[in-house]
Amino acid sequence: MYQVKGYFSSLKGSYYEIGKQQGEFVKQHSYLIPQFIEQENLISHNHWTESRNILNQYCYGVNEEIEGFCEGLKIPAKNMMYYYQTLLKAGCSHCVVLPKKTDSKHTYVLRNYDLSPVIDDMRFCSTHVEGAYAHSGFSTQYFGRTEGVNEHGLSVTFSACGQPVGNIAGLRKPMVIGLQCFAVIRLLLEKCKNVQEAKLLIEEIPIASNINLIIADPLNAAYIEIFDGHKSTITIDDEKQAFIVSTNHAVSSSIQKLNNRKLEQSTKRYYLLHEHLNRCEQVSIESLKKLVEEEYPAGLT
């Protein structure tokens, strides 16, 4: 059987201190080092400076965390791949079900994240950084988050909206200057208590990723599509609509005008999940787990 090793991390202290903690961990597991360091001089001085500046403006503390990480490993911060992959210049499924439609009367959030373990951190991380809300979720490039829930019960999940955007081969070139999704998600988890605060912050920050975000707090949820810098937001509450579904294509009319391409499997996964939630009067955790445990086309995996 193919086995993959994962990790649990509990990070506490200042940004710089938790950076040093992570650097010490990687030092003890030296085979992890290559995934953080660029070896081909991909990062120009200007790109590195711009990346640091935008992180300092919108994601305060992450630069300090990276400095602590680099201090522990005795490597230059300029060589960190995070700076190259975070600033972007121009087969996931997820949903939220609000209390009215769940068997426990609590909000349920589901996400199926299809990424190769070869390029994934494989790390579920509980982060308690000074001056930010504590949160737990999966990390990417150690400093980013692919999803999570914070101490106030705010959860954030995402899927690509069409072809993923990035600075590496095979990804769509960004059309605007802005942040990658994993920087945005961590920012939302650390700075926002509820859906309303998250919506306001998303309107402020430059985002280059083409993504579908589902943001939920204990009573409300929002679905946000972002494509080439354009943003469309739909908000629901427990009185009007009980769930939101997203896969890898746009459903809002404004974003569909910009990108109406749909992969067949994305459409099928969307309707599979939507019909399951529509059919169930009361959704259970067990029924959601069954969907993500079954392989496509019967399930979401």
Label the predicted regions.
Residues M1-H94, E190-E203, P218-N220, F243-T301:
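C-terminus-biased signal that marks the final domain/tail of proteins
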Residues Q3-K5, Q21, L32, F36-Q39, ...:
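A contiguous strand-loop segment
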Residues V96, Y108, N212-I214, A221-E225, ...:
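Ordered hydrophobic segments in well-structured contexts
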Residues N112, N150, N212, F243-N248:
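Asparagine-centered polar/low-complexity signal
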Residues Y113, A160, L219, D228, ...:
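A broadly conserved detector of short glycine/acidic/proline-rich loop/turn motifs that flank catalytic sites
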Residues N167-A222:
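Loop-centered beta-sheet repeat module
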Residues N220-Q241:
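Extended amphipathic alpha-helical segments with heptad-repeat/coiled-coil character used for oligomerization
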